[in-house]
Amino acid sequence: EEDEDFIRQQTLKLLYILAGFFSLSLENAYLFEDLKRSYFDTIRAVANSVEARDPYTRGHSARVADISKVVAAELGWSKRDIELIDWGGILHDLGKVGIHDAILNKPGKLTDEEFEIMKSHPLIGSQIIEGISFLEPVTPFILEHHERFDGRGYPRGLKGTGISKEGRILAVADSFDAMTTDRPYRKALAARTAMDELLRVAGTQLDPEMVTAFEKAWRTGKIK
C-alpha cells in the first residue's frame, strides 16, 4: 500500500513537472508541434495506466471519446470542436491517477467518505492540464463531466447551460459506457436498456438536447 501511494504521488509530481516544462518551451515555435504531441501522448498514457489498474474500465476513456465525437458531429459541430471533445473524452478520468486503488476498485458501494474522495478526480484532472495552452480549452470539460443538468452534480453543482456543452456530452457518453460494460457489482446492460435509462434521466441528470442527439446517432447505428 505504501508503494502504491508513493507511485501515485510520483506520477502526479511528474505530470506537474512536465506541465511546467511544456509551458516554458512554447517560446520555441519549431518545437511546439512535437512537444504538443509528446505531452499529449504522455498524459494519455497516464490516463490509460489508471484504467489498466481496473480491468472493468479498460478502454473506457477511448470509448467515451469516440461516442462524444459522434454526438458532436450529429449536432453539426466544427472539426476543431470535435477534436477538442475527443481530447476531453480521452482525458476526462485523468484525475483518477490521484485516487487510491482501494477506492477505485472497490467491488461494493463506496462509503460517504470514499465517495467524497472519488468526487475529487475531476478537479485533480483539470489541475494537471491547467496552464497548458493547447489543452486549456479542455480543462472545463474534464472538470464538469460529473455535473448534472439539474444542478445536483459535482464538483461545483453547475446547472443547465451553466455546464459547458462538452461537459454535457461527456456526461451522456460516460453514463452510456458505464452502463453497457461489466462492473464488479453487475453485468453490462443491453444497449437498449441503457438507452431507455438515458431517456429516463434526460432533464434531470442529463441534458435532453444531448440525449436526443445521442439517441439519433444510436438509432442510425453510429453508436453501438
Predicted regions and their residues:
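Amphipathic alpha-helical "output/dimerization" segments
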Residues: 5-27, 83, 165
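Sensory beta-strand/linker motifs that couple input domains to effectors
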Residues: 1, 24, 181
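Metal-dependent catalytic cores of enzymes that make or break cyclic nucleotides
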Residues: 9, 33, 40, 44-224
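Surface-exposed, flexible loop/turn segments at secondary-structure boundaries
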Residues: 3-4, 184
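PAS/PAC or PAS-like capping segment
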Residues: 2-3, 176
